[in-house]
Curated annotation (Swiss-Prot):
The gene is hrcA. It comes from Staphylococcus saprophyticus subsp. saprophyticus (strain ATCC 15305 / DSM 20229 / NCIMB 8711 / NCTC 7292 / S-41). This is Heat-inducible transcription repressor HrcA. Gene3D superfamilies: 3.30.450.40, Heat-inducible transcription repressor hrca homolog, domain 3 (3.30.390.60), Winged helix-like DNA-binding domain superfamily/Winged helix DNA-binding domain (1.10.10.10). GO terms for molecular function: DNA binding. Belongs to the HrcA family. Negative regulator of class I heat shock genes (grpE-dnaK-dnaJ and groELS operons). Prevents heat-shock induction of these operons. Keywords: Repressor, Stress response, Transcription, Transcription regulation.
Length: 326
């Protein structure tokens, strides 16, 4: 446990180090924060924080910078404070859904880019699991003799367009009947009763195969989509890392683009803000932090957001942004 003054000094060192990108000395703290104490007192308190391994001293400067433990202490205090604050939820995500005509992929891609601009860090937005949503309607449109377009409409409002290669000679009326049948029976199609209902609905094996091809395509498409990740501001992470950390950029990018990041976001899945710092993520990723939260498109459809930056991240701004997302 540290004193209130030591906590204030630790907070100031973390925030100044984020702003200035260099070790912080007692003179800088006094000038920037108008502290009404002597430099000697500040240096003594900094020595105490150093003994607690919350800050570290460089060999080339008398200043201090926060250790990973110090940043964790700072973040925990910040999360505790913000958890008691009333947050005003923004409607931007819902607005983007409408602007993109309920195209979920375009919406989440735009959302990742806008959040990256607002936070000034790299962002990831995980696509929701389609099983959270319910299919409201499936429309079939014959594009040509070889292609049928499936328009899948969900109760959340978002729409997916799938292309089914098929030369089965079905009229528009027949396609409409199949659309209505599949819409009504989609959630039952892996049930043993579905086969009986399908046999009662159509007699032709060709039409049965067409319907099964439809259902398989829908399932395969959304199983693939469930792991989709949209990235905003990829270059910001590279820019944020100092030249001395160039060697760490490649493993960081490999981590982000691998399945490991998906697994991590699943583990951190929660309605509240979660923060992982440096070695808490992986031993080779000591230079970055990941802040995650949950977003909601409606009461049913939700996914994970992550903001990725250097360990010297502006946590206050990032947490504020994620707290306002709905």
């Amino acid at each position: 446990m540290i004193s209130d003054r030591q906590l204030s000094i630790l907070n100031a060192i973390v925030e100044d180090y984020v702003d200035l990108g260099q070790p912080i000395g007692s003179k800088t703290l006094i000038e920037r924060h108008k502290l009404n104490v002597s430099p000697a007192t500040i240096r003594n308190e900094m020595k105490q924080l150093e003994d607690l391994e919350l800050i570290e001293k460089t060999h080339t400067s008398s200043g201090r910078y926060p250790s990973e433990s110090g940043i964790r202490y700072y973040v925990n205090q910040l999360l505790q404070e913000t958890s008691h604050q009333q947050q005003t939820k923004m409607q931007r995500l819902k607005d983007l859904v409408i602007e993109n005509h309920y195209d979920l992929s375009s919406t989440l891609s735009d959302f990742a880019n806008e959040l990256s601009i607002a936070s000034q860090y790299t962002t990831l937005v995980m696509r929701p699991n389609h099983k959270q949503d319910i299919i409201n309607n499936i429309h079939l449109i014959r594009a040509n003799a070889y292609l049928v377009i499936m328009v899948v409409v969900f109760t959340s409002g978002h729409v997916e367009h799938l292309h089914l290669a098929s030369e089965v000679p079905l009229s528009n009326d027949e396609l409409t009947k199949i659309s209505n049948f599949v819409t009504a029976k989609y959630n039952e199609w892996n049930n043993h009763r579905f086969e009986n209902e399908l046999n009662a609905f159509v007699k032709s094996d060709t039409e049965k195969d067409f319907i099964k091809d439809m259902l398989n395509m829908i399932d395969i498409h959304f199983d693939n989509q469930s792991n989709g990740i949209f990235m905003g501001g990829k270059v910001k992470l590279i820019d944020a890392l100092n030249e001395s950390n160039v060697s760490s950029i490649q493993p960081i990018l490999q981590y982000i683009e691998s399945n490991k990041i998906t697994q991590l976001l699943d583990e951190m899945s929660n309605t509240s803000i979660n923060v992982k710092i440096g070695h808490e993520i992986e031993s080779s990723l000591s230079d970055i932090s990941i802040v995650t939260s949950e977003y909601h498109i409606d009461d049913r459809l939700k996914g994970q957001i992550a903001v990725i930056g250097p360990t010297a991240m502006n946590y206050q701004n990032v947490i504020r942004l994620l707290n306002t997302i709905w």
